[in-house]
Amino acid sequence: MTSRTAMRSHRCGDLRAADVGARVTLCGWVSRRREHGEHLAFLDLRDHSGVVQCVVDGAVDARSEWVVRVTGTVARRPDGTVNAHLATGEVELSECALEVLNAAEPPPFPIDARADEVDENVRLKYRYLDVRRERMQRNLRIRARVNAAIRAAMTEQHFVEVETPLLMPSTPEGAREFLVPSRKEHGAFYALPQSPQLWKQLLMVAGLDRYFQIAKCLRDEDLRADRQYEFTQLDAEMSFVGVEDVLAAISHAVVAAARAATGEDPPPIRRMTWREAMDRYGTDKPDLRFGLELVDATPVFAGTAFKAFASAAAIKAMRVPAATHPEQAASGRAALDRLTERAKQLGAKGLVWLKVGADGALESPVAKFLSDAERAALVAATGAGAGDLLLLVADEWSVACTVLGQLRCDLARPPVHEGPYAYVWVTEFPLFVGVNPATGRPQPGHHPFCHPHPDDLERLEADPLGVRALAYDLVLNGWELGSGSIRIHEPELQRRVFRHLGISDEDADRRFGFFLHPFRYGAPPHGGFAFGIDRLVAILAGEDNIREVIAFPKTQSDRKSTRLNSSHVSESRMPSSA
């Protein structure tokens, strides 16, 4: 489609050498003005497409960020003045007539890359100026391409886009909800959706077969680099499917999104179970861009005389090559003491370290407590060589894994947007994770509607914490993009799971009746997934903070500066029951 409008013939960034001699009209903002002698001035004219140089009469009054309309002739730049850094750098606009469409006050910060160094709260206060910059224009357009690609990918797989309600009953999904008071019923509240989870399952009961939505969700959680009160996700649900069907459909959308953002197909999406991810990487969000995999050293120390290891349920080890973190070797014991303190902060009782000397011998205060066979077996199990550092945590299995997993990231993890893209599906999560200390009941791993793994159903009553779920997460560069599961479609099985959570049949009817009752009318087997578009776009755009890919994000401290956060409401505007 042409960019021509009633006010312009071209966009600023469109002009090329092939346009030389053409008379064109452009509209945009004055990015920079440079005087050239007494009678000429160069204006860099900018719009969302790029920048072009315009040669104007020196008497023309046009300053930074003024909105102007320029009509001129496309000409080649004189020899020696071509700007290879601009797409329009071979040409300029000469014989220009300029019309001022709107004057502007001097901006509070440069509308270019220099604004990256400006305090973020200032950028957010003047977000409408910040978004004029090339970086922000690029990010928002990447986001638009990703959304379009996702819609196309889902539609071609016969998914139907359906909008679900924003006002819904309050349900316990794990995070704090935003509540909206009812005007009709005093003391009653709607909740803004943390996800369309319940609605999309009802759509499967309704026979829609395949649903999707690019949904706005809201959770009253603390803000951080990868979290906002409001976030956008691809939400999808499918009937008559198994795990592989859901993963294939979502993978297709992810590949389409990555291709739209980067122009290239992403690498194949890897697969591993939750147990494997924890064992090898110490986290259910493994970053596969670098090594330092964990090793199970428990068999190495079976029957050991070393008391710290003898009483431990599990012993995990990690080899840190000298080249991976040379400052550890350079700073010696002080750096190792810091690692030990960090391990304790993460919940470990302590950290055992051993260095491999030039002769292959293990050097450590604890080395003398290990037998020759144990030292040799440890070196063999980890593949350690001269100059390497071995870190070991002996504790409960989950503690040993997570502590070493975090140390792994502390030592070697690159920024999330750097390096290759490493996608991985993590499957077979636990149905329940730990026990709620207040109730003594298990806590749901993902949410209460995940279907138990068929192979583990017989263990549901006797060993609920050992039951796997048909649940899965998609992880990119150590960031969880989203999660999903095959859902419980049998009412009685759903009630069994609720009972484990301490939700009685009566309580379930009261809290989830609007959701459970339709399942009595023939709910099909179904499953789905949701992934965060903000996080995906941030990584694909090379950003380490999702605020950089959201037009008007929120921060903890921006209420007074932006006027776009919460505000006080007068008593007269408060809702009252009718």
Task: Give each language-model segment a name.
Residues 1-563, 570:
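Class II aminoacyl-tRNA synthetase catalytic cores and aaRS-like
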Residues 564-578:
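Single conserved hydrophobic/aromatic residue that forms the stacking wall/gate
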